[in-house]
Amino acid sequence: MAAWSPAAAVPLLRGTRRLPLLHWAQRMFASQTEAELKVTQILKEKFPRATAIKVTDISGGCGAMYEIKIESEEFKEKRTVQQHQMVNQALKEEIKGMHGLRIFTSVPKH
């Protein structure tokens, strides 16, 4: 039987994106990153009637790709493409430094 070594355990401690599983566990229970908080704050200012805003760094921690979910009355009677354009316009300066952005918009159901 081979001796155990830390190097042998590395494959067991990796997540699906080749990042340590410990990183994913810490991220799952952590609050928002500074960049996520910044984007969230901008969206709160641009969409004051929003009932829900969630910004998630989906790049693995480098801040290059985000998923944004926002629910707001401001989107009422607008097509999805128009809603997404509103979000893009609100974040136009931040988008310059991003690799990608996933946007999910909705209108609150009463």
UniProtKB/Swiss-Prot annotation:
Report the subcellular localization.
Answer: Mitochondrion
The primary location reported for this protein is: mitochondrion
Task: Tell me which UniProt keywords the record has, alphabetically.
Answer: Mitochondrion
Give the matching InterPro entries.
Answer: BolA, BolA-like_sf, Mt_Fe-S_assembly_factor
- Domain of life, per the record? Eukaryota
Subunit record text: Interacts with NFU1.
The record's section on PANTHER family has: BOLA-LIKE PROTEIN 3
The family annotation for this protein states: Belongs to the BolA/IbaG family.
Task: Supply the name of the protein.
Answer: BolA-like protein 3
